[in-house]
Amino acid sequence: MSTRHTQRTGGRISVRRNEARLAHARARARFDWLLLARGRPSKLYGYASRHRGELIHLPWPPCWCLELHHDPYRDARSATVWGHRWGWPATHVRPRCVQDCALDSCLYVCCGYGEKLQPVGFVKSYVTNSQLDTLRVLLVGKDGAVYVHHMRAARLCRLASSTTEFTRRGLQRDAVTYEEDLELPDQRMCGTNARHLFDVIAAAADEHNLLTVGGLCQTHAGVSCNLLETVGDPWTAVPAARMTLTVPQVQYRLWPEARRDLRRHLYAGHPLGPWLVCGVLSRERETQKPSPPIRTTVGNVPTPGPREVEIAWVVLTLAGPLLAFWPDTGKICRLANSFSTLWKMGPRAMRGHWTYSAPGRHLPGDAWPLCEHVRPQVGKLPRKRAYLD
């Protein structure tokens, strides 16, 4: 009986994997024209001009597409009077550089190397038909990287480093998509009582009631739920992180030095206002140490290398956004704008280092994006940078 059940389950998994491969192959076929950007992104201008108005279904999320347009910024300015006043200047119609997205006159977004970007069209939803859809532009870089530019929010998100990666991820790295798409599934996996408790905490957080959230976390400390994460394709999800309710005193006893680091980031009079440590996010990851060997063989069966548990505190602020604080490294960054967004993003919210902010539009709690242009030397980690205003 169990063997038959295993065979049936294995057959379902293999069918699901085959469907994922076919979906990825179809997505790659739809976006093969993005390969024209290698070396000269301006080649995409002619393709987008010839196929203007054509809708191309995005790999993820469902009901989202790309409307090809050779000059999307001009149409955005004509359709919305105030649209061009948000975000980057109107001269962005020509291929620009990542250097133009500097946070000030001396500091670039990620490094001092520029990257030519070519706009190819609007990113929009089939469900909503709004003029604000013309304020979300897809851009392609010289090295094949794909970006989405939110003109209204003045933010540039690096979706993928190559066309192949974009056909697999889609808009998974864009945090704004999780907030705007109401049909995205909840990534929580827990019991009914735990789910109801987290919903009550989320409702209290939306009302900016830190006292209620703190009381619930103290009464129900230790209650947890798993957060699912997609692996390989956007439709296969596995438990990858755990969200556990806690109280600050317990975490301060475990990490005495982390309390001082957290108060240095969230100082008195911070724009985000009062704050509260309400939970802990934990997930396993492979270590970066070269020894012991990363992969060993036991009985001719390869086993994964050493793994460690990554722990981040969930900090709720009075202004609304959730912050993640790593007590071992002292790093802090914006996790999500609300609990509902965190439930949709899952563990992916812990790796939010792909968004660049325009000058003067850097939000408190935004992490510096990871640089994709300058690779660190082997055995060396990137230099730490400031994380909060």
Curated annotation (Swiss-Prot):
Predominant place of localization: host cell
GO cellular component: host cell nucleus
Protein's UniProt name: G2/M cell-cycle inhibitor DR6
Spans through the membrane: none
Family: Belongs to the Roseolovirus DR6 family.
General remark: The first DR6 exon is not required for propagation in cell culture. Loss of a part of the DR region may occur in viruses propagated on cell cultures.
One BP term from GO: symbiont-mediated arrest of host cell cycle during G2/M transition
UniProt keyword annotations, A-Z: Host G2/M cell cycle arrest by virus, Host nucleus, Host-virus interaction, Modulation of host cell cycle by virus
Summary of the function given for this chain in its UniProt record: Inhibits the host G2/M cell-cycle progression in a p53-independent manner.
Native source organism of the sequence: Human herpesvirus 6A (strain Uganda-1102) (HHV-6 variant A)
Domain characteristics, as noted in the entry: The N-terminus is involved in nuclear targeting.
Keyword Transcription regulation attributed: no
Subcellular location: Host nucleus
